[in-house]
């Protein structure tokens, strides 16, 4: 039994269906889901050491691939100020303005 199978057996005891999204359940495939440890570029690596080409891209947000250096650096820089405040921030205003300026049909933005 591989590490992914071991993790899945543990997960089903504490997480409904063993995964936090029905699409991750691999039900139609008839096998335990792969548990991913890391990713780089267009590749993901499971806890068993297998390498896969990532055609899922986290269902959209990883369009530039995983661990893209400029994005990683920007995230590290942003984290230095804190992660989540539960209050309004200047960068929210800047992001909303950027979106509205670049998508003329969008008048307002709400980020949740």
Predicted regions: what they are:
Residues 19, 47, 59:
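Fold-independent oxyanion-binding glycine-rich loops
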Residues 34-54:
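Active-site and channel-lining beta-strand-loop segments
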Residues 1-38, 92, 98:
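Active-site-adjacent loop/helix segments that line or gate small-molecule/cofactor pockets in enzymes
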Residues 15-16, 46-47, 70-71:
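Short, flexible segments with low predicted structural confidence
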Residues 51-112:
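Glycine-rich loop-to-alpha-helix module at the N-terminal edge of alpha/beta enzyme cores
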């Amino acid at each position: 039994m591989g590490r992914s199978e071991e993790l899945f057996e543990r997960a089903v005891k504490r997480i409904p269906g063993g995964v936090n999204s029905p699409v991750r359940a691999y039900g139609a495939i008839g096998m335990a889901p792969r548990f991913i440890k890391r990713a780089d570029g267009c590749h993901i690596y499971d806890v068993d050491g297998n390498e896969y080409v990532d055609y899922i891209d986290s269902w959209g947000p990883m369009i530039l691939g995983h661990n893209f250096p400029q994005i990683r650096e920007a995230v590290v820089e942003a984290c230095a100020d804190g992660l989540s405040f539960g209050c309004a921030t200047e960068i929210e205003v800047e992001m909303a303005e950027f979106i509205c300026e670049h998508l003329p049909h969008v008048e307002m933005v709400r980020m949740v």
